[in-house]
C-alpha cells in the first residue's frame, strides 16, 4: 500500500511537468484528491492486534503511522485548493514548481511515516527541509521571509547532526537499524549517565521539529511569512514529525529507565505550554497567535509522550491528528481574512460576522475545537494527556490547569476579536465568501467528525 501511495505521488509530479497549462490545477487537485481518498484504506485495512502491517524490508505501517500517513495525503489537495487563488496568477513555471513541491513534501512524509529503517527515516525526515524552505522564501509575502527561512534551516540542521550520531551509535550497538529488530534485540551496556546523554542527543531534532517551548523561535517566523499552503502543511503535518519521532525513540529506549530525564523534560514541557498560552493572550497578529498555540499544544504532546504511558501516547497521537486539522483550518481561515483586508492585525480585522456570516460559523467551530469543547477529538486527546500527566505527578496539576485555562481564553479571543465589534473602514467593501473557502473548511471538519464517530481509528491499541 505504501509503495502504491509513493508511486501515486510520483505520477502526479510527472503529470504536472507535461500537462497543458489550462488543465494544470484541475489535474493536480483531482489526482491528489484520489491520493487522499485512497490513503484511509491504510487505517481500515490495518490489523490493530498486530504492531506492523503491509510489512516489507523497508516500508510498513502500524497504528501510529497509518493515521499520520492518511493525514499527509488528505492535506495535499486541500493545500493546493487553498493556494489556487493566489498562485494561479503567477507564471506557468512558478505554478508547476509550487505544485511539484507540495506533492514532493507529501511523498517525503509518506516515506518518513512508513520507514522501517531508521536511516531511511532520517533521510526522509531531512528531505522535507529544502522544499519547505523554498515555499517560505519563494512564496512568502514579505522580505522577512528570508530571515524566517534562515531560522528554519539553522534550527533544523542544528538538531540533525546529534540525531545522525545517535543512529550510528545504535547501529554499532545493535548491528541493525530496522525498528522492529532494534526494539527486540537492543540491550545497551553503557552506563546510565552515558544513556541519558545518548537519549538527550537523540531527541533534540524532534524537540526542534515539534517544537516545544525553548526550541520554538523559528516557528512563528516561518508561519507568519509562509504562504497559506506552507502554513497548512507545516502546522498539520511537519510539526507531527517531531511527535512521531519521539514515540518511535521512546519505544527503542523502552528497556532503559530514563526517569531522571523524564522528570526534567515533562516539567519543562508543561511549563512551556503554560508560558506559550500566556504569550498567545498578548498576541496582536492572527497568524502569530495560531503559531504560538501550536507551540503550546505540541509542548503538551511532548510531555505526554515522555510520560511513557499508554494513555499519554494515545492522547498525544489523537491530539496531534485533531489539532493538525484544526490549526490547518485556522490558518486557511486567517488567509481568507488576509486576502480581503491585507492585514493580520486583530485590532483591524474585527466585525467580520456582519460581512461574512457563514465564515463566522467556521471560525466558531474551529475555535471551539481548538479549546477542546465536546464532542471534538481534541477533548479526548486532552483528557487522556491530562490524566496521564496528573497520574505521573499530582504537582503538575496547577501548571496544566492554568495552561488549559489560558488556552480557552486565547481560543475564545481568536473568535471574539476577529468576528465581534464594528468593522473598520478598510474591510467594509470586501468580497463575500467563495465556495472554495467553505469547501476547505468542510474538508478540515469532515475527518474530525469521523474521529468523533470512530475514535478507535486514532488509537494505538497494541501498546502495552
UniProtKB/Swiss-Prot annotation:
It catalyses: a ubiquinone + NADH + 5 H(+)(in) = a ubiquinol + NAD(+) + 4 H(+)(out). One of its GO terms (biological process) is electron transport coupled proton transport. It is an enzyme of class 7 (translocase). Belongs to the complex I subunit 4 family. Keywords: Electron transport, Membrane, Mitochondrion, NAD, Respiratory chain, Translocase, Transmembrane, Transmembrane helix, Transport, Ubiquinone. The lineage of its organism: Eukaryota, Metazoa, Echinodermata, Eleutherozoa, Echinozoa. The chain crosses the membrane at residues 1-21, 63-83, 98-118, 119-139, 152-172, 197-217, 227-247, 261-281, 288-308, 314-334, 355-375, 389-409, 443-463. GO terms for cellular component: mitochondrial membrane. Its EC number is 7.1.1.2. It is a multi-pass membrane protein. It comes from Paracentrotus lividus (Common sea urchin). It is found in: Mitochondrion membrane. Core subunit of the mitochondrial membrane respiratory chain NADH dehydrogenase (Complex I) that is believed to belong to the minimal assembly required for catalysis. Complex I functions in the transfer of electrons from NADH to the respiratory chain. The immediate electron acceptor for the enzyme is believed to be ubiquinone. It holds the Pfam family Oxidored_q5_N. GO terms for molecular function: NADH dehydrogenase (ubiquinone) activity; ubiquinone binding. InterPro entries: NADH4_N (IPR000260), NADH_Q_OxRdtase_chainM/4 (IPR010227), NADH_UbQ_OxRdtase (IPR003918), ND/Mrp_TM (IPR001750). Its main location: mitochondrion. Signal peptide: none annotated. PANTHER family: NADH-UBIQUINONE OXIDOREDUCTASE CHAIN 4 (PTHR43507:SF20). This is NADH-ubiquinone oxidoreductase chain 4. The keyword Nucleotide-binding does not apply. The keyword Transcription regulation does not apply.
